[in-house]
Curated annotation (Swiss-Prot):
The chain crosses the membrane at residues 4-24, 38-58, 87-107, 114-134, 140-160, 171-191, 210-230, 241-261, 272-292, 301-320, 325-347, 370-390, 407-429, 457-477, 482-502, 537-557, 582-602. Signal peptide: none annotated. It catalyses: a ubiquinone + NADH + 5 H(+)(in) = a ubiquinol + NAD(+) + 4 H(+)(out). The lineage of its organism: Eukaryota, Metazoa, Chordata, Craniata, Vertebrata. GO terms for biological process: electron transport coupled proton transport; mitochondrial electron transport, NADH to ubiquinone; mitochondrial respiratory chain complex I assembly. GO terms for molecular function: NADH dehydrogenase (ubiquinone) activity. The keyword Mitochondrion applies. Disulfide bonds: none annotated. It is found in: Mitochondrion inner membrane. This is NADH-ubiquinone oxidoreductase chain 5. GO terms for cellular component: mitochondrial inner membrane; respiratory chain complex I. The gene is MT-ND5. Belongs to the complex I subunit 5 family. It comes from Gorilla gorilla gorilla (Western lowland gorilla). Pfam families: NADH5_C, Proton_antipo_M, Proton_antipo_N.
């Protein structure tokens, strides 16, 4: 029973020595990146054994707790929960990180600080695993803040570039807003439950208040880039491509969705929280898909596809299916990491060119990268029997059978169609047609550190969904019986988007519009949201803060009230004194009347 718990602990602790060696010997050798990559690969192989044992045993979860500290009101402990979610996620995260680290050996080869880069990647992975295995809110918060600060350091890796620094600060600021919600939920549960353990919180809060649930939703919206707190995700593309791959596949962005999954029992009894989660996820998935349609930066297209898929996961939790959302997290990690690697390979070979309009004809120049990019895009669309199909098709079927919200369902279906459209557009513009890049570009993809990770993730994108779905623990939910036309909804919507993209691509080559329509600008400018929040609102605030003191202090007090008023009175007095006519009797009378008035008052 405790064998797999021991082996999991062994796997997790084996990741710590590479970090400790950097403190003992700061002047590391050039073999350090290979050492870190080998450690992560070994840890992945070790983690397969406890996961297999867990699936074979009828154990629901094992919780290992170590007492840490006791205050007057609460007992803090280091508590690790090894259940279905953590045991399935650990091998996926390790496998993807192993591939990304091997890819980084090629991509970051010329970077003088490559050792520090690998250390940051490893700490990023460890903090995510702390978050996944945590069994109390405080420990989860440590992992939560860990992935936040590591994302800040990695996005701003090329710190000499202004855009990279801005993107890193933007990421940390948007996540700070999400952290407000998390800390609000922490304080509420400490006040009302006197506990941060999920089990005790579920028992004591059978009908929980809306405030902590909104706090969790705000935290998830910040970390998983939901609508309103999403601008940091496309900006994070300023970091190195391996960072983007790790950030978007199995670490930072899925942390928010994982938080909602971990505390799903609290939201199940609150219909308003569920509805808000569903609507937020549905709007996000549509908005991100619309934005991806007109982007020309290959990394930003993949970034918006991540945001769209995260919205789909949040919407799935909103219809009460957290297990399906988790399944989509696991399947999504494979093809999303591979899409970023293929993008990085193309960018690197085309001398840092990221505009898909300046690519084309790469199918013959880079056959393996092109094949993997096509497979990853098809898996993202949800093509049958690729990895993405096993989770995406299930989500759409479940949404079809749900009577919760037809509006949200229709939005999800439209977003699915648009996903197919922008993925097809990316394939057509980058891989097919005539080359549109300079002829002197030195294209060479014959590096083992480039090909091996892409091959591994391609195999994962083909078969991982099949293996994961066959190892899902049996649940008490009865099998659904649905009509054939509903079963084929997801596939038909995907094919519709694919055909639309083909048709639009044909029109683009044949017809040239003089002026793009307003809908194009809405999509291309990301719904004008970054311009409004980052430019217009600060500008208006600055303008008001400048004008208000100017009006109150300079114009009114220093000009109108004091100098001008005094001068006006002086002018009036001088006019009065200068208009004397020499009428002595009248002047004496003017003295006499006040004296008479005073005497009357005295008497």
């Amino acid at each position: 029973m405790t064998m797999y718990a021991t082996m999991t602990t062994l796997a997790l602790t084996s990741l710590i020595p590479p970090i400790l060696t950097t403190f003992i010997n700061p002047n590391k050798k050039s073999s350090y990146p290979h050492y870190v990559k080998s450690i992560v690969a070994s840890t992945f192989i070790i983690s397969l054994f406890p996961t297999t044992m867990f699936l074979c045993l009828d154990q629901e979860a094992i919780i290992s707790s170590w007492h840490w500290a006791t205050t007057q009101t609460i007992q803090l402990s280091l508590s690790f929960k090894l259940d279905y979610f953590s045991m399935m996620f650990i091998p996926v995260a390790l496998f993807v990180t192993w591939s990304i680290m091997e890819f980084s050996l090629w991509y970051m080869n010329s970077d003088p600080n490559i050792n520090q880069f690998f250390k940051y990647l490893l700490i990023f992975l460890i903090t995510m695993l702390i978050l996944v295995t945590a069994n109390n809110l405080f420990q989860l918060f440590i992992g939560w803040e860990g992935v936040g600060i590591m994302s800040f350091l990695l996005i701003g890796w090329w710190y000499a570039r202004t855009d990279a620094n801005t993107a890193a600060v933007q990421a940390i600021l948007y996540n700070r807003i999400g952290d407000i919600g998390f800390i609000l939920a922490l304080a509420w549960f400490l006040l009302h439950s006197n506990s941060w353990d999920p089990q005790q919180m579920s028992l004591l809060n059978t009908n929980p208040n809306l405030i902590p649930l909104l706090g969790f939703l705000l935290a998830a919206a910040g970390k998983s880039a939901q609508l309103g707190l999403h601008p940091w995700l496309p900006s994070a593309m300023e970091g190195p491509t391996p960072v983007s791959a790790l950030l978007h596949s199995s670490t930072m962005v899925v942390a928010g969705v994982f938080l909602l999954i971990r505390f799903r029992h609290l939201a199940e009894n609150n219909s308003l929280a569920q509805t808000l989660t569903l609507c937020l996820g549905a709007i996000t998935t549509l908005f991100a898909a619309v934005c991806a349609l007109t982007q020309n930066d290959i990394k930003k297209i993949v970034a918006f596809s991540t945001s769209s898929q995260l919205g789909l996961m949040v919407a799935t939790i909103g219809i009460g299916q957290p297990h399906l959302a988790f399944l989509h997290i696991c399947t999504h990690a494979f093809f999303k990491a591979m899409l970023f690697m293929c993008s990085g390979s193309i960018i690197h070979n085309l001398n840092n060119e990221q505009d898909i309009r300046k690519m084309g004809g790469l199918l013959k120049a880079m056959p393996l990268t092109s094949t993997s990019l096509a497979i990853g895009s098809l898996a993202l669309m949800g093509m049958p029997f690729l990895t993405g199909f096993y989770s995406k098709d299930l989500i759409i079927e479940t949404a079809n059978m749900s009577h919760t919200n037809a509006w949200a369902l229709s939005i999800i279906l439209i977003a699915t169609s648009l996903t197919s459209a922008y993925s097809t557009r990316m394939i057509l513009l980058t891989l097919t047609g005539q080359p549109r890049f300079p002829t002197f570009a030195n294209i060479n993809e014959n590096y083992s550190t480039l090909l091996n990770p892409i091959k591994r993730l391609t195999i994962g994108s083909l078969f991982a969904g099949f293996f994961i779905t066959n190892n899902i623990l049996p649940t008490s939910v009865p099998q659904m019986t649905i009509p054939l036309y509903l079963k084929l909804t997801a596939l038909s919507i995907t094919l519709l988007g694919l055909l639309t993209a083909l048709d639009l691509n044909y029109l683009t080559n044949k017809l040239k519009m003089k002026h793009p329509p307003h809908t194009f600008y809405f999509s291309n400018m990301l719904g004008f949201y970054p311009n409004i929040t980052h430019r217009t609102i600060p500008y208006l605030g600055l303008l008001m803060s400048q004008n208000l003191p100017l009006l109150l202090l300079d114009l009114i007090w220093l000009e109108k009230l004091l100098p001008k008023t005094i001068s006006q009175h002086q002018i009036s007095a001088s006019i009065t004194t200068s208009t004397q006519k020499g009428l002595i009797k009248l002047y004496f009378l003017s003295f006499f009347f006040p004296l008479l008035l005073i005497l009357l008052l005295i008497t």
